[in-house]
Amino acid sequence: MIRGALAAWRRRVRRPRRAAAPRALILLYHRIGEPGVDPWGLTVTPARLAQHLDALRRSRRVVPLHELLERLRRGEGRLAAVTFDDGYSDALTQAAPRLADAGVPATVFVTTGALDRPAEHWWDTLAHLVFAGALPATCDLELAGRPFRMSLEAGASGDHAEATDGPWRAWEPPPGPREALYRALYDLLLPLRELERRRALDALHAWAGVAQAIRASHRLLTAAELRDLARRDHIEIGAHTVTHPWLAAQSVADQAAEIAGSRQAIERVIERPVTAFAYPYGRTEHYTRQTVRLVRRAGFALACANVPGPVDAGTDPFQLPRLQVQNWGVEEFAARLLNLT
């Protein structure tokens, strides 16, 4: 019996197997700078980015995002594409030079609502407000038309800027009152429309006694900077809505305006067609089938999500998976790529 089983196993091993379909991966970066307070792990240092790009180009052929699916259909393998979300100004000052040095093309997805004024994304503003400096012992406010009350207990005093510059991330259970406050406020603000969110943040700044200021480290691209970035040979610009809303929580009309409006705004600035889109936040709960239809209707050729997974020739071009890269050392970075494909 044992000999028969061994012989059968040998026959299976020797039997020619159909070659696996070529697969690729798409990397997703956000900020390039020093992490500081970074509850969502969005920041990769410039040095780490350079290491990642070097490791990536040594192991795969990095191609422009818009070429990826067609190359897979032709049977090309070991491909990768690089993307950056949210339109941080460091895409121009930090990422672009390192991409050029490595000879790596990339797509930068830009939110357009702040192209004409200095601005930060709301989650960065919230983290700075919650973790930098002393706070009142109780947060007791009306936010977005509903009462919000939370006690900070012993966590109200002192500077907690290091609380999230370490093991805690916002998807983990909060270890203290500041982290709990941040997550509760984040969840409250996430589904709001932009005007409601601004009013809520104004109320929170007044409660905390924190002056509203746009930090150079978190500032978004201006129109002039976007135009400069788009001139780089290795950079493609994609759309990422106007105000970075949770699209699934918005009306169909508001979704359509956010999707098409961002494309139109970018095209006015860079004077060339925009064919790629990325869903804000990008998990499956953040957009719907209707959202995908609206993206198609707006004239885009592809759209990216924020769900890890490989890409093959049969992948839906309007739900392309991406691996969100964190500030990993080069060995962990390489291991993550290997595990994905």
Spans of features found by a protein language model:
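C-terminal active-site subregion of NodB/CE4 polysaccharide deacetylases
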Residues: 1-83, 90, 118-129, 135-138, ...
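Metal-dependent polysaccharide deacetylase catalytic core of the NodB/CE4 family, i.e.
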Residues: 27, 32-33, 100-285, 320
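Short amphipathic alpha-helical segments and helix-helix/interface helices
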Residues: 50-53, 96, 201, 223-227, ...
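Short acidic, Gly/Ser-rich segments with clustered Asp/Glu that frequently serve as metal-coordination loops
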Residues: 86-93, 98
